[in-house]
Design a protein with these regions (language model features):
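NAD(P)-dependent Rossmann-like dehydrogenase/reductase catalytic/cofactor-binding core
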Residues: 194-261
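Glycine-rich Rossmann-fold phosphate-binding loop(s) that bind the pyrophosphate
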Residues: 8-9
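Small-residue helix-packing motif on alpha-helices
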Residues: 29, 72, 187-195, 216, ...
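Aromatic pocket-lining residues of Rossmann-like dinucleotide-binding sites
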Residues: 19, 23
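N-terminal Rossmann-fold NAD(P) dinucleotide-binding loop
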Residues: 12-13
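Internal alpha-helical scaffold of NAD(P)-dependent oxidoreductase catalytic cores
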Residues: 100-105, 121-158, 168-209, 253-257
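Rossmann-like NAD(P)(H) cofactor-binding subdomain of soluble oxidoreductases
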Residues: 16, 30, 36-39, 45, ...
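Extreme N-terminal starter segment of soluble prokaryotic enzymes
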Residues: 1-4
Length: 261
């Protein structure tokens, strides 16, 4: 499969990183980018650079649109002007298919940065999910992690807030945890990052063993104990409400981006 990325921002870099780690050859990946710093990074990674006007002659299986929302619709038109038969996957958040000039040839995707190490979760939506292009999109993102085909496009806003943005919300919580861990004095032989990484990986292992958060919490807390005191503090601070509002804010921003186009 030969693919081309139009734009080389964070999410494009994550996807490409995951594809290369999955065994895809760099010879099968091309990029279109104007930013000089990113061009230098492309050269460091030995990725092929092409020009937009050469798209048609390259005969790519998929073209991934990975530009800023404000540039997405103009760039999409330029792509189809250059290569009218293209199948385009957009990773741009918030912009509905009907905003594009050729929605029947566009597949919406919402990957997250965990694609870089094969642990990504990507949501896909297209009007025709039985098409060859959609099947190729599933094959492509399956190299970078787990793929979900959404039943309707409206779900993409919430998927964006939970999967696309949600990692950052949890990172914010873990950042607080790390700051608290740094207050403890360890012997020189103890590596703080190793301790933290061990803790974080244990969370996933615990859930794999027991996929019920209430049971996991009950295994740790005891009546009148330290965990109970901390949990009551979180409840008094309305932590659940804070997270729900964060997800809602991200979802609403996705809707706003769509309405701005």
């Amino acid at each position: 499969m030969n693919i081309c990325f139009v734009g080389f921002g964070n999410i494009a870099q994550a996807i490409i990183g995951g594809l290369l780690k999955s065994g895809m050859s760099s010879e099968n990946i091309a990029c279109i980018e104007r930013n000089q710093q990113k061009i230098a990074l492309l050269k460091e990674k030995n990725l092929r650079m092409i020009q937009l006007e050469n798209l048609a002659s390259e005969n790519f299986d998929l073209i991934l649109l990975a530009v800023k929302p404000k540039d997405a619709l103009r760039t999409e038109k330029d792509i189809f002007d250059s290569a009218p038969k293209s199948i385009l996957i957009t990773v741009v958040a918030g912009i509905a298919l009907n905003k594009y000039s050729r929605p029947g040839s566009v597949i919406r995707s919402m990957p997250n940065t965990a694609c870089a190490f094969g642990k990504g979760i990507t949501g896909l939506y297209a009007d025709d999910q039985k098409s060859h292009g959609f099947k190729n999109a599933i094959k492509l993102f399956s190299r970078t992690g787990y793929v979900l085909a959404l039943e309707n496009e409206g779900e993409m806003h919430r998927f964006t807030s939970i999967i696309g943005s949600g990692q950052a919300f949890l990172f914010q919580v873990l950042k607080v945890y790390l700051l608290e861990l740094e207050k403890i004095s360890f012997n020189d032989g103890n590596n703080l990052n190793d301790v933290f990484n061990h803790f974080v990986s244990s969370l996933g292992d615990s859930f794999a063993e027991e996929p019920d958060f209430e049971n996991l919490i009950n295994r740790i807390k005891s009546p009148g104990g330290t965990t109970q005191a901390g949990l009551e503090s979180l409840e008094n601070s309305e932590l659940d409400k804070i997270f729900r509002e964060a997800f809602e804010a991200a979802k609403n921003r996705s809707i706003e981006i769509s309405n701005e186009q």
